[in-house]
């Protein structure tokens, strides 16, 4: 009976849970009363989820699905330190899986229908994943007092709770998901690298993605901008991905573990996806005052010998990022921890902004910005604060370190002189987005300027776009002409924070493709909904910016779409 009451509550919240009003700027906004839930153990050892914020329970959550009103779902989970670490994390996972089970299915369905040609993963991938889990469990048993492996174990326990919560909430036998399904969902962005490693090891299975799918490597734009007067440091990220992946969530985890966990960060807030414990974008705010983000470099040659270095005897990136964010206390320590157990999958340029090192109006201390880049069998990182002191750090899917660039195939010779080329044959400084960052970043003076820049796409008028809507900060590949060359892919969000915001632990985010200079994206236009079947998404993405905290969210005045760079 309790399960039925909770499910009815979730449904009623979807229908009636928000009130539209006018803010002081006469802009429409949503003032939401976010439903709260708690979880405890029953006498039979099973979990019970019930309405209300019971501070004596194992964990409490605020959850609402506002995809149709603001383009985001929202979940915030807090655990009770009176319970042991394993119970806290498993209950937190269960609570998330139970409450967001509908969004989880929508995310899974959209991925399977559009990404995998056979609507399934191959046996080789599943065998690889099982071997990887076996390796981690062995290391957990051998290193029971090591904080690194203690935290790896906590991630696996959270995933197990997530699976069980989903299974108990889901009433549809056609929508059952196993623990292996959740493992595959969480490692999804790493599967292409693993498939390439299996191919190079003469594996019998190698499945090409659906032809509709975006580039195997997720691409993004990121900017870390220091104001001229040293009064503010902005950090922003725009995710590039397939539009079918736009079932989105902002998540906040406040886990209060024992000293054995050695956590330097108890609270994290990030943009993410239902059923996935990492950000994927990636964009994290930590209460240690670190902000962690990345753009994907990848490996240019699918036949590269580097793929042979990918082995199951490692820890995948999706787990390493959670562990590292929790136990790192600085940019340098973050790099040292993240280097451990390098899987060589999801090879990114990571940026770690340490707001503890930024003294407003005075100086930017060494260690404010570290950059970390990864390949199979090799990593490189450095303190690049000196570059930030010149005004900004850009990130646009091209390696910064020369060795990484050479090894991953970005610096091969080419006769092409077209600066619009995305082949990787041009200099780091000559990529279109690199030139846009250089031209426009010093025109950012306010948070509104920064928001507008992270959403910028004026490809028809920007000479650096070379007529290509993909050569902008927030790409719109759906606007490519002729239409038969277009794809429903591009920038799907933007997130920004700053010293002022992180001191309040606030993130400002906008969901969906940019619609400042360009028209909003609609599934009903250009026959997109037939080419990319999706569920759980609105037809049109024309949402405003929203400010998120660890307990609530609300409107934020939109960045001016009249700003021209």
Swiss-Prot record:
One of its GO terms (molecular function) is phospholipase activity. PANTHER family: PHOSPHOLIPASE B-LIKE PROTEIN B-RELATED, PHOSPHOLIPASE B-RELATED. GO terms for biological process: phosphatidylethanolamine catabolic process; phosphatidylinositol catabolic process; phospholipid catabolic process. Its main location: secreted. Its EC number is 3.1.1.-. The gene is plbC. Transmembrane segments: none annotated. Keywords: Glycoprotein, Hydrolase, Lipid degradation, Lipid metabolism, Secreted, Signal. It is found in: Secreted. InterPro entries: PLipase_B-like. It holds the Pfam family Phospholip_B. Belongs to the phospholipase B-like family. Residues 1-21 form the signal peptide. Glycans are attached at residues 53, 84, 118, 200-201, 211, 266, 302, 406, 485. GO terms for cellular component: extracellular region. It comes from Dictyostelium discoideum (Social amoeba). The keyword Metal-binding does not apply. This is Phospholipase B-like protein C. Probable phospholipase.
